[in-house]
């Protein structure tokens, strides 16, 4: 905040970005940032207004960075662009005040000019068995033997268009439901604040594929409004399996795939790019739809990672690197023609 004293330029202090060491003055706990950095400026000796570094986009109305601001950085100033994956601490101010990189830092294609969706920390259920979101919003860890379901939604929603994302099943314990919710139904159905799974209870506002592979509790079913619409999707979830989701908000259809193959709807193998054999059909309401997951812990702590196109499952990069037809996103498997990664540029164009 304005006029707040920082540890920068004190001379006798180790300067850190993304890490706060409270050992000397607080409770001895060191905390770390779990998020994204874009352009990071530190100016020594001059106070500039925000308009020096950013401006309002005339088309979208969004605040965007000025990529080459006119700034005098001073002797100890620096400008981190994070544009070199092998030297994320390189100073672009001209001062050569380079930083040493520590920890498991990853370069991201998600930037203020094109943000990809992540898990939303504001959509977590509040209770004593709180799930933990990490890896810049791409990993969700539940609690072992909590017998408590939690729904977590994405940071971005869509009202129209065709969308694709991938979720990695990364545990042998509990259940993982992968799907989407109608935003207007969140509070009305209490499926965020109460102990609910996607598609659970008297909930006509969420749709999901349910996966489980724990102590005989092997499930692979479609779930909506507290009912199973398909008793067996013909796959067996295992640790490391990738569940694919195709959501068509132009025609009210949804499909799920498993490790690169669209699953059978009961009438035939789904073909999202032609609209054939959807796993669900629904009437699209005039409101936002949010990608979502729910986890339910028993016989092991449930965990999943999600990739909306950023190219990683947690800290692990995808092996393949397939983009959508607009050239955005990086996926393990093909989004198929006409389906797009969940990012702000695609939503501006298609959503």
Stretches with model-predicted labels:
Residues 1-47, 62-89, 261-263, 271-279:
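Extracellular glycan-associated modules
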């Amino acid at each position: 905040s304005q006029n707040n004293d920082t540890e920068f330029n004190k001379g006798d202090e180790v300067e850190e970005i993304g890490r706060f060491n409270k050992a000397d003055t607080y409770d001895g706990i060191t905390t770390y940032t779990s998020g994204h950095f874009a352009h990071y400026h530190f100016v020594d000796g001059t106070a500039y207004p925000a308009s020096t570094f950013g401006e309002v986009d005339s088309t979208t109305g969004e605040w965007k960075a000025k990529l080459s601001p006119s700034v005098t950085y001073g002797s100890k100033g620096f400008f981190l662009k994070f544009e070199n994956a092998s030297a994320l601490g390189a100073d672009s101010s001209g001062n050569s005040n380079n930083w040493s990189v520590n920890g498991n830092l990853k370069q991201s294609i998600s930037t203020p000019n094109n943000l990809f969706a992540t898990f939303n920390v504001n959509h977590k259920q509040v209770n004593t068995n709180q799930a933990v979101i990490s890896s810049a919003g791409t990993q969700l860890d539940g609690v072992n033997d909590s017998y408590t379901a939690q729904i977590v939604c994405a940071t971005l929603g869509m009202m129209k268009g065709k969308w694709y994302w991938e979720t990695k099943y990364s545990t042998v314990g509990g259940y993982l439901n992968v799907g989407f919710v109608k935003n207007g139904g969140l509070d009305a159905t209490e499926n965020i604040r109460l102990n609910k799974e996607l598609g659970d209870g008297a909930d006509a506002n969420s749709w999901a594929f349910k996966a489980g592979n724990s102590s005989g509790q092997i499930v692979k079913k479609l779930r909506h409004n507290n009912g199973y619409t398909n008793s067996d999707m013909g796959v067996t979830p295992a640790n490391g399996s990738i569940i694919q989701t195709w959501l068509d908000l132009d025609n009210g259809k949804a499909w799920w795939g498993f490790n690169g193959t669209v699953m059978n709807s009961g009438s035939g193998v789904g073909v999202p790019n032609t609209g054939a054999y959807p796993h669900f059909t629904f009437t699209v309401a005039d409101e936002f739809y949010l990608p979502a997951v729910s986890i339910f812990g028993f016989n092991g702590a449930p965990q999943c990672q999600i990739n909306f196109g950023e190219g990683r499952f947690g800290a692990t990069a995808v092996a393949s690197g397939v983009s959508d037809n607009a050239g955005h996103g990086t996926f393990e498997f093909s989004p198929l023609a006409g389906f797009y990664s969940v990012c702000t540029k695609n939503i501006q164009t298609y959503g």
